Swiss-Prot record:
SMART domains: KRAB, ZnF_C2H2. Its main location: nucleus. GO terms for molecular function: DNA-binding transcription factor activity, RNA polymerase II-specific; RNA polymerase II transcription regulatory region sequence-specific DNA binding; zinc ion binding. The keyword Nucleus applies. The lineage of its organism: Eukaryota, Metazoa, Chordata, Craniata, Vertebrata. The gene is ZNF878. Residues 4-90 form the KRAB domain. One of its GO terms (cellular component) is nucleus. May be involved in transcriptional regulation. This is Zinc finger protein 878. Belongs to the krueppel C2H2-type zinc-finger protein family.
Amino acid sequence: MDSVAFEDVAVNFTQEEWALLDPSQKNLYREVMQETLRNLTSIGKKWNNQYIEDEHQNPRRNLRRLIGERLSESKESHQHGEVLTQVPDDTLKKKTPGVQSYESSVCGEIGIGLSSLNRHLRAFSYSSSLAIHGRTHTGEKPYECKECGKAFRFPSSVRRHERIHSAKKPYECKQCGKAFSFPSSVRRHERIHSAKKPYECKQCGKALSYLVSFQTHMRMHTGERPHKCNICGKAFFSPSSLKRHEKSHTGEKRYKCKQCDKAFNCPSSFQYHERTHSGEKPYECTQCRKAFRSVKYLRVHERKHTGEKPYECKLCGKGFISSTSFRYHEKTHTGEKPYECKKCVKAFSFVKDLRIHERTHTGEKPFECKQCGKTFTSSNSFHYHERTHTGEKPYECKQCGKAFRSASVLQKHIRTHTGEKPYGCKQCGKVFRVASQLKMHERTHTGEKPYECKQCGKAFISSNSIRYHKRTHTGEKPYKCKQCGKAFISSNSFLYHERIHTGEKPYECKQCGKAFRSASILQKHVRTHAG
């Protein structure tokens, strides 16, 4: 039997052409080529391995190796297969006598953006291949996952998807032992160990492992967001972000946790959630050994060591280590708050903040401390609380060496050195170091007291005030002095008390140099100078 060279049935792209394809076009290409090779095998054809094994920078050649691996995963046989040809029809007929060539009438006149992709995705050697190809236009997905009902165009796609449910991870990293569902995933992971990052940004010097990551990164500098939601018009840096967002409109949540029944719309969120049950933190910082549940949070953490702030505000020039903090900041300029609570009409800049706020109405506190059983409405509050048990204070002030449990508390502290008070009251002009202080102050003008005690009906201007007040009913005093054993209702009272033992007086009068244990006592003292 004659040997069939890989190139006889392959679509060829240059590196430049491949880089221009969007992910959906690349995925279509992969699926079709996998099916093609299976079909050739089933009818007894052989192909030349030299192309599949060839390691080269060209992504297409690396893809050949991937196809070879995927082919070995499946024993499924097919009677006929799709052959995408790069030669004219008459040449094809000479190579494969008696085989008719079919052309798609649906896509024959539709341009996909690249002439080579246009040319190759239209011609087929078998009628069954044309039928398979037709699904890309009709949207037909006949292969369905038995676990979650998600549908796919190809049987190979549903088999790969089913591994998410089965937790089957046959591909293991030789360096760290981490297991993966697919060979492509383990190869991506191995780059973490090899530190091979061939794509370097000329603007900030950051190096990236993948061309797609590099292109997405460049959009942070240019501000370009080419992927737009057809429903609400919101734009995104990458197609994967757009896909995740689109599911927020459909309400589709295919990935369900077996432990708590919580559902998710994407597998990465589902895997991250599973680790909250298992406690697994597979991503470790090489500098401080701190571990994280996702590689995304590790990358953000690493920037604290390097000082890198790749997200820069075009309005004020301020830099940020994460896209989340950058987006939060952007909305301080616009004042945009599109997410509104249906119960109290309070509005938020981000849907995540709305979800956390809604828990104040429902009473839901999904984050529980394993040491003391205390529960929290948000993961941030929970992580901050955990550090009260461990004593961990990872955020250190470079000026005085004082350490803090959270980055936000450190930022507030830094302003005691700089004197910066960026939050000003529009009614009286009084300025504050933190936004929460301004909000509480504004309520002294409006008379608003949104936090009411259910036991006695007393109302308060802040959540902290009502929390401390509730402890007068319960008798709870969670802050205990290690030196004398005295306990306190609030952290402020506790800190003030600690200074009696240490002698610390951090609040100093600028006029006479006298120092005090608390800001309130300093303010009283300052008035004695004013007369």
